[in-house]
Amino acid sequence: MRQKTIDAIMAHAAAEYPRECCGVVAQKSRVERYFPCRNLSAEPTEHFHLSPEDYAAAEDWGTVVAIVHSHPDATTQPSELDKAQCDATLLPWHIVSWPEGDLRTIQPRGELPLLERPFVLGHFDCWGLVMSYFRQTHGIELHDYRVDYPWWENSYPDNFYQDCWYECGFREFDGPPQEGDLVIMQVQADKWNHAGILLEGNMLLHHLYGHLSQRVPYGGYWQERTMKIVRYKDVRGNEACRK
């Protein structure tokens, strides 16, 4: 970034302090410009939600090339949510600390390995792991049902696993479970709220809330909480699927 752009970002961080500032860097031909954006977060001292209208205004001017936000009274160390959102935007993120005035840039990491992912609801969660498994193993893009709120709590109407497994391409099947089947579970909730993938050797690949993604033996606790096992209909060798 050019010094003029950095100066504009620091001035915005100072003006918004102790709230998090947010904005974008845009490029038009050889001209680089910082666009301050409104932070619409309900907790602006802890998080940022960049105004879609302000983002669109920057896009109208040129090409958005980076996302910017500040960490008030903290270092530039990115949180797991920062990293996950950077991955999702496919753009560099510039993080500034204020009042220290430090600057750090993080880059999108691409597709993460299936094991030992950090948990970030709405990004790296149980359905996110299932999506990545099918993308990495079969080249299949499943529908993205991820949301960043605890939809399994009774105060929310959503019931994604129970309502959406069929429309997403999964089917009941005849015969025993096999590698690649989707295991839908109900864990400390009144709804089906967790899922994993069966692996060879009766292992379960899953990503539990607040934990790293992992492989565990499928039995006992997880088997007792299993509500349904289904199979993706369009994978070669899955002819046992029902219509």
From Swiss-Prot:
Enzyme Commission code: 3.4.-.-
Compartments (UniProt record): Host cytoplasm
Binding-site residues for Zn(2+), renumbered to this chain: 69, 71, 82
Database matches in InterPro entries: JAB_dom_prok (IPR028090), JAMM/MPN+_dom (IPR000555), MPN (IPR037518), NLP_P60_dom (IPR000064), Papain-like_cys_pep_sf (IPR038765), VirAsm_ModProt (IPR051929)
Catalytic site: 126 (nucleophile), 194 (proton acceptor), 206
GO annotation, biological process: proteolysis; symbiont-mediated cytolysis of host cell; viral tail assembly
Read off the PROSITE patterns from this record.
MPN, NLPC_P60
GO MF annotations, alphabetized: cysteine-type peptidase activity; metalloexopeptidase activity; zinc ion binding
Provide this UniProt record's keywords sorted from A to Z.
Answer: Host cytoplasm, Hydrolase, Late protein, Metal-binding, Metalloprotease, Protease, Thiol protease, Viral release from host cell, Viral tail assembly, Zinc
Q: Where is this motif: JAMM motif?
A: 69-82
Could you tell me the superkingdom of the organism this chain comes from? Viruses
Q: Which SUPFAM superfamilies did the record assign? A: Cysteine proteinases, JAB1/MPN domain
Q: Per the similarity annotation, which family is this?
A: Belongs to the peptidase C40 family.
- What does this chain do? Plays a role in tail tip complex assembly. The tail tip complex is assembled successively with three tail tip proteins J, one tail tip protein I, one tail tip protein L and one tail tip protein K. The tail tip complex interacts with tail measure protein to initiate tail tube assembly. The formation of the tail tip complex is completed by the addition of tail tip protein M, which is followed by tail tube polymerization. May be excluded form tail tip during maturation and would be absent from virions. May be involved in tail measure protein processing.
Question: What is the protein's name according to its record?
Answer: Tail tip assembly protein K
The source organism is: Escherichia phage N15
